[in-house]
Amino acid sequence: MTKLDFKAVLKQHHTVRLHQTAQDWKQAIQLCIHPLIAAKLVQPAYFDDILKSVAQYGPYFIIAENVAMPHAQNNGTVQQNCFSLVTLKEPVYFDNDPRPVRLLIGLAATSAAIHTTEALPQIAALVEDTQVVKDLLDCCDETSLFAVIDRVNLHKYLT
């Protein structure tokens, strides 16, 4: 089994924020990354790294309908492999991209290997079902959120 467990990380580090309000996509990313900074899992510069990546590549981390996974390469700013999860009351839109985003799953990985072999497979399993995404967006508290996550086999794509 993986050493990086999506649900366990969210619970252990208290990195879930539900029904947040963001004026724009930058504030949405800030809401998503701030819990990781507050828990000292990433340095504040990690947020800047994500903004630089968006400026260079566009919103490459919109991965499903209503879902973005803000992350960037570790440039020495990631202290520990971690996740955050934020839902928004209203969608945000990235510049020149018509896709709405209401669920943000923050990811910070210490290495590319962790990113591709442990983190991404769990997130893919979580968001591949649009009903699960809808149910996550409807959650009013962490108990209901974790109950939705428990319905998903997060390890099905792990090798």
Swiss-Prot record:
The keyword NAD does not apply. GO terms for biological process: phosphoenolpyruvate-dependent sugar phosphotransferase system. The active site is at H71. GO terms for molecular function: kinase activity. The keyword Kinase applies. It is found in: Cytoplasm. It comes from the Bacteria. InterPro entries: Ascorbate-PTS_EIIA_comp, PTrfase/Anion_transptr, PTS_EIIA_type-2_dom. Residues 9-152 form the PTS EIIA type-2 domain. Gene3D superfamilies: Mannitol-specific EII, Chain A (3.40.930.10). One of its GO terms (cellular component) is cytoplasm. The modification Phosphohistidine is found at H71. Transmembrane segments: none annotated. Keywords: Cytoplasm, Kinase, Phosphoprotein, Phosphotransferase system, Transferase, Transport. The phosphoenolpyruvate-dependent sugar phosphotransferase system (sugar PTS), a major carbohydrate active transport system, catalyzes the phosphorylation of incoming sugar substrates concomitantly with their translocation across the cell membrane. The enzyme II UlaABC PTS system is involved in ascorbate transport. This is Ascorbate-specific PTS system EIIA component. It comes from Mycoplasma pneumoniae (strain ATCC 29342 / M129 / Subtype 1) (Mycoplasmoides pneumoniae).
